């Protein structure tokens, strides 16, 4: 109900030069959500919920490695009142995601996965659509951790190992760069080597 109120209400905003501006919300239309294998429920639910909350029709394409979870998540949305016409599920490998991003009715894509795949989707959207299509892509990060002389070495060691190696390092929040103050470098490196054995 709150979403409907937001969508049906225009807000008048004062402009910096005295003009009047109107802010209104409207759906994009048909949104494609492509989710990864490593957080198959959390990311998929977030993508679907956001797209539906904004009033969009949603096509879901989970990773081919998490098809059953994608099916179960979509089924739960349907069981709780989301019409099949508003949320559809497509199962298959990456060629399906590639084909779906070429469909002209797609007005937005939420994608979590590799940079190369995001670039392919972006290229499809640019080449095959007459208008600009929204692309929300989460493709990874270069995450940095700094350890200085105030660090508790045991805690830092645990945090570094978990951040770098949980999920085999295959997540966007994984540690990629570690900066260590000279004063603790040798001790921390020794502890890290010991933990990795």
Labelled PLM ranges:
Residues 20-21, 88-110:
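A structured beta-alpha segment of the ubiquitous adenosine-cofactor-binding alpha/beta core
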Residues 76-83, 108, 116-197:
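ALDH superfamily catalytic-core signature
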Residues 39, 65-68, 94-96, 115-116, ...:
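Short alpha-helical
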Residues 45-46, 71-72, 101-102, 120-124, ...:
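Short amphipathic alpha-helical segments
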């Amino acid at each position: 109900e709150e979403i409907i109120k937001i969508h049906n209400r225009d807000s008048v905003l004062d402009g910096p030069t005295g003009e009047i501006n109107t802010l209104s919300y409207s759906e994009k239309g048909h949104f494609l959500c492509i989710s990864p294998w490593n957080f198959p429920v959390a990311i998929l639910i977030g993508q679907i919920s956001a797209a539906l909350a904004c009033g969009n029709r949603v096509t879901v394409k989970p990773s081919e490695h998490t098809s059953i979870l994608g099916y179960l998540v979509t089924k739960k949305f349907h069981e709780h009142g989301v019409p099949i016409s508003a949320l559809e599920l497509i199962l298959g490998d990456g060629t399906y995601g590639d084909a779906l991003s070429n469909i002209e009715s797609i007005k937005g894509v939420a994608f979590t996965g590799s940079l190369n795949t995001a670039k392919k989707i972006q290229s499809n959207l640019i080449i095959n659509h007459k208008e600009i299509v929204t692309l929300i892509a989460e493709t990874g990060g270069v995450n940095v951790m700094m350890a200085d002389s105030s660090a508790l070495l045991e805690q830092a060691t645990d945090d570094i190992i978990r951040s770098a190696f949980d999920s085999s390092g295959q997540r966007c929040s994984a540690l990629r760069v570690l900066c260590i103050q000279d004063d603790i470098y040798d001790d921390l490196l020794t502890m890290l080597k010991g933990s990795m054995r």
